[in-house]
């Protein structure tokens, strides 16, 4: 699943540890052995098929602004669709499963630096707090450096098996709406 977005000053979701975080919410409908997440900024001329395009991306897709990506994969304590209410999501407990800053496996940014991010997380079935089970996850992203996060970004989430029913969105109300369809 590919998501194209635009991060800008003032539209962050949370300030945590002095950094402005933005979140993409991810519903995983089945047990997964592994998840991969990659993020790059800017999107530039990347060729992407069937991507989810946010309204902010559409409005700013020609922007040349980019940022040094830093990503986290976090799991909530919401394990079923019935628990995915606005109130529950807003007060959910989040456990960071993995994080990544700079990856040499990703394309360089326009400055020629390896400041794009890639992480792979393998489910740890022997530990219920680290297993990739059905439920609500989020991808947190910010910049490693202090300062504002601004620019287009491409986020891709994948698994080694087909997971029909995966939902990726920045908007919690859209997530709830899609879960209830």
What are these regions (language model features)?
Residues 1-16:
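N-terminal leader/pro-regions and domain N-caps
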Residues 9-11, 20, 76:
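A near-ubiquitous, low-amplitude feature marking generic local secondary-structure context
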Residues 13-15, 19, 58, 126:
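Short, well-ordered helical secondary-structure segments
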Residues 17, 30, 130-134:
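Surface-exposed coil/turn segments at beta-strand junctions on protein surfaces, enriched
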Residues 19-21, 28-36:
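Extended extracellular/luminal ectodomain segments enriched in beta-structured repeat modules
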Residues 24-25, 45-181:
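C-terminal edge strands of extracellular/lumenal beta-sandwich accessory domains
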Residues 33-43, 54-57:
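A short beta-strand element within beta-rich, extracytoplasmic domains
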């Amino acid at each position: 699943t590919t998501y194209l977005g635009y991060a800008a000053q003032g539209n962050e979701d949370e300030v945590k540890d002095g950094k402005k975080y933005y979140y993409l919410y991810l519903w995983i409908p089945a047990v997964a052995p592994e998840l991969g997440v990659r993020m790059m900024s800017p999107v530039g001329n990347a060729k992407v098929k069937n991507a989810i395009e946010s309204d902010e991306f559409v409005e700013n897709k020609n922007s040349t602004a980019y940022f040094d990506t830093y990503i986290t994969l976090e799991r909530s304590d919401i394990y079923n669709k019935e628990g995915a209410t606005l109130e529950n999501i807003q007060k959910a407990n989040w456990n960071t499963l993995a994080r990544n800053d700079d990856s040499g496996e990703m394309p360089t940014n326009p400055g020629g630096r390896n400041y794009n991010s890639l992480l792979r997380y393998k489910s740890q079935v022997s530990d219920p707090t680290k297993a990739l089970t059905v439920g609500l996850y989020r991808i947190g992203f910010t910049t490693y450096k202090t300062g504002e996060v601004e620019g287009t970004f491409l986020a891709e989430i994948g698994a080694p098996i087909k997971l029909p029913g995966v939902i990726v969105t920045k908007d919690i109300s859209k997530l709830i709406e899609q879960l209830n369809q």
